[in-house]
């Protein structure tokens, strides 16, 4: 836990890691609280009809222990990969805690995955078991024959299918279970990378990953836990963002976590959840925050009680930061990390560590720098790759079954991120773009984030992405893919207005010379734009046609 020091520089100097010899995530987020406050509410589930449900730490600990015993009785052993293909809710949280308690490895997967994406991850991980619902089961059936290592299917709802075990039969069993004694480096969790730049890789984490998240988490939520704190995120718990930026750290600190049914993001529903469930702390990725802007005068329509608001996953940008400050009455604490090494940079609005358009400063306990291709630390103001120095408790153990990729991730003791950035004289880091996303035009290196932020501020634009399109004269030109707000007509007049908007706010070399109006943008399950697909589309357009 962070010492409650209200000065960032002093906090940075005085912070020390205290990693115990043994640590188990499942015990820390359930049994530890159940022993001292069993009636304390740990999970709440929002229902649109008002029939909200709640679960106490006592019940959470008992059910997850029973579930762990049930998995063990069905042949699941320590070290086995156990997939969780469930929506946010009590069952998913119980499954996570149970898997950690028994020393197995949790493999969270998104219900948005198609048949091939699901099969790829299950096969690559060699998953021994999967816990899913009827929707996930139907996806699984199509590829079951390709998964010889998958021995157990636990079904969380619906009738009993041949070869499956009902979730309730395991969770309602005998609750006495001797949790595995695990060390911080023992494998606990495997999350597949987003696949924004290539085939997804399984990032394997030890139990220490939760401890590694705590300083940055407390920093951007201003010394959480405070009285009345309650957490919600629209992010899927199958993503590092939803799981490690919201669910697990909150449960560790005794802060109730609110879940809601998986659905297409709806701004009004998001505000309703925050109002009805008395949400005080939220993690809302930048794309979702931009979609919230469609609701005019939100504080007049909804009684919000937000104390802290964190955002990460993509660059937030000045426009969205200023909107939240003006319309929500709160400064967003932007932070940064990736699946392999999360929350290593963070803003702390409560400590005055905030600069619109910046991701923040290095979080206590983490060494972060901008380096060149040889691993040399670059001076302030120089653009290079964001890198994190090992050892670090939040850093992954390695890529599953891919030692070559793990080695390639490091230059000496610096873990490279593949993200271009810059650090200023005050120590603030600004995201420039993925290595592959940086646009080279007329000799300029242009980060797409600033252009997208500017586009998002246009009154007619709902979402936008900028990529480089090959050009024989300029190397590349900026091409923007734009989703317009409802009711706005697509056409050259609208495109010209958007071009002028960017030209007047940024610079002549950064405005999009081409604009394509689209109904939607390709997204990962974690809400990141897959610019690679848009680049491929732009490159195909640039190639001369034959015949």
Specify the residue positions occupied by each region the protein language model found:
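Conserved pre-ATP/AMP-binding loop-to-beta segment of ANL
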Residues: 38-41, 154, 159, 172-194, ...
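AMP-binding/adenylate-forming catalytic core of the ANL superfamily
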Residues: 113, 120, 130-133, 282, ...
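Conserved AMP-binding/adenylation subdomain of ANL enzymes
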Residues: 211-233, 238-280, 291-295
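Structural core segment of the AMP-binding/adenylate-forming
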Residues: 73-74, 97, 101-169, 182, ...
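Gly/Ser/Thr-rich phosphate-binding loop
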Residues: 252, 279-283, 293-354, 367
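Conserved AMP-binding/adenylate-forming core of the ANL superfamily
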Residues: 39-97, 114-119, 166-168
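Conserved AMP-binding A3 loop
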Residues: 53-58, 188-215
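Conserved ATP/PPi-binding loop(s) of AMP-dependent carboxylate-activating enzymes
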Residues: 362-365, 376-408, 446
């Amino acid at each position: 836990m962070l010492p409650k020091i209200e000065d960032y520089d002093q906090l940075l100097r005085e912070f020390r890691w205290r990693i115990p010899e043994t640590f188990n995530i499942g015990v820390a987020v359930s049994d530890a609280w159940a022993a001292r406050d069993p009636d304390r509410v740990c999970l709440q589930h929002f229902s649109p009809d008002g029939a909200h449900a709640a679960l106490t730490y006592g019940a959470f600990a008992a059910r997850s222990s029973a579930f762990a015993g049930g998995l063990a009785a069905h042949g699941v052993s320590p070290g086995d990969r156990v997939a969780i293909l469930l929506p946010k809710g009590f069952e998913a949280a119980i499954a996570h805690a149970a898997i950690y308690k028994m020393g197995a490895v949790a493999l969270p997967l998104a219900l948005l995955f198609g048949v091939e994406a699901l099969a790829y991850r299950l096969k690559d991980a060699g998953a021994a078991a999967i816990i899913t619902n009827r929707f996930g089961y139907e996806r699984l059936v199509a590829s079951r024959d390709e998964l010889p290592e998958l021995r157990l299917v636990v079904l969380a709802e619906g009738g009993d299918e041949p070869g499956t075990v009902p979730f309730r039969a395991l969770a309602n069993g005998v609750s006495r279970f001797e949790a595995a004694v695990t060390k911080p480096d023992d494998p606990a969790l495997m999350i597949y990378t987003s696949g924004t730049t290539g085939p997804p890789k399984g990032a394997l984490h030890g139990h220490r990953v939760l401890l590694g998240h705590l300083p940055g988490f407390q920093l951007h939520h201003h010394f959480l836990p405070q009285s009345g704190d309650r957490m919600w995120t629209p992010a899927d718990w199958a993503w590092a963002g939803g799981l490690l930026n919201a669910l697990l750290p909150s449960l560790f600190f005794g802060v109730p976590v609110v879940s809601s049914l998986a659905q297409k993001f709806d701004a009004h529903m998001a505000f309703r959840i925050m109002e009805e469930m008395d949400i005080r702390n939220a993690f809302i990725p930048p794309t979702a925050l931009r979609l919230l802007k469609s609701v005019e005068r939100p504080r007049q329509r909804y009684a919000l009680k937000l104390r802290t608001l964190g955002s990460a996953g993509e660059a937030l940008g000045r426009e969205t930061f200023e909107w939240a400050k003006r319309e929500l009455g709160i400064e967003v604490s932007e932070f940064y990390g990736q699946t392999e090494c999360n929350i290593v940079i963070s803003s702390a609005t409560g400590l005055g560590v905030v600069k619109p358009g910046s991701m923040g400063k290095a979080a206590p306990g983490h060494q972060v720098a901008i380096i060149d291709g040889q691993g040399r630390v670059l001076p302030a103001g120089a653009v290079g790759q964001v890198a994190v120095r090992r050892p670090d408790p939040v850093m992954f153990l390695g890529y599953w079954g891919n030692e070559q990729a793990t080695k390639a991730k490091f230059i000496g003791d610096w873990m490279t991120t593949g993200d271009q950035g810059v650090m200023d004289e005050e120590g603030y880091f600004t995201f420039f773009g993925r290595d592959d996303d940086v646009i080279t035009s007329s000799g300029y290196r242009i980060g797409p984030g600033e252009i997208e932020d500017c586009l998002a501020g246009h009154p007619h634009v709902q979402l936008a992405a900028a990529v480089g399109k090959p050009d024989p004269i300029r190397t590349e030109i900026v091409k923007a893919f734009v989703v317009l707000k409802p009711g706005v007509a697509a056409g050259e007049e609208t495109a010209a207005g958007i071009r002028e908007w960017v030209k007047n706010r940024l610079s002549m070399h950064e405005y999009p010379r081409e604009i394509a109006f689209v109904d939607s943008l390709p997204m990962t399950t974690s809400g990141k734009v897959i610019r690679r697909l848009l680049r491929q589309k732009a490159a195909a357009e640039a190639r001369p046609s034959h015949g």
